[in-house]
Amino acid sequence: SEMCIRDRNKKTVFESGAILIYLAELSGKFYNTKDRLEINQWLMAQMGYVGPMLGQHHQFHHYNPGKSKFGEDRYFKISRRIYRELDERLSNSKYLSGSNYTIADIGTFPWIARHEWHDIGLKSYKNLTRWYEEISEREGVKKGFAFMNESETPPKPCLLYTSPSPRDPK
């Protein structure tokens, strides 16, 4: 199913990235003009790379484990590369698109919030962990998790899982 919203004026917007841009422009928040190019680049990276690749990882590792060694290996390696790339970016920047929390962070965070499904160990990535923990403490993020499931909060980062993937080097 595709994500879609309809506003008070009966304007319909579909696709998560377009919805984030639309709502940010309406509210005047999380999408400042000065950093718009950088924000768009990181939001598009999430939409075209981070989300689809981690989504494939979920398919092979979480929903259908043991069905395709090729798929599991491929998406594990890509997921680890995504973590490294995000960690490297966040070594030079407080947030993905600069010094301010933006829709690029809002779009990317839910994928990293499923870090327990990635068999990687978030705490192995110092800068990504800092970013994740800081965003996890935002009131809006907590409210979002509570809205989806009252007992759920953003998962805490860990170094190793109780049953780490044999593919994940220490």
Question: Which residue ranges define each predicted feature?
Answer:
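GST-like domain detector, emphasizing the conserved glutathione-binding G-site
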Residues: 1, 6-77, 87
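Single conserved hydrophobic/aromatic residue that forms the stacking wall/gate
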Residues: 2-5, 161-170
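Residue-level signal for nonpolar/aromatic packing positions in well-ordered secondary structure
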Residues: 6, 19, 86, 105, ...
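GST superfamily/GST-like fold recognition
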Residues: 54, 58, 96-121, 132-135
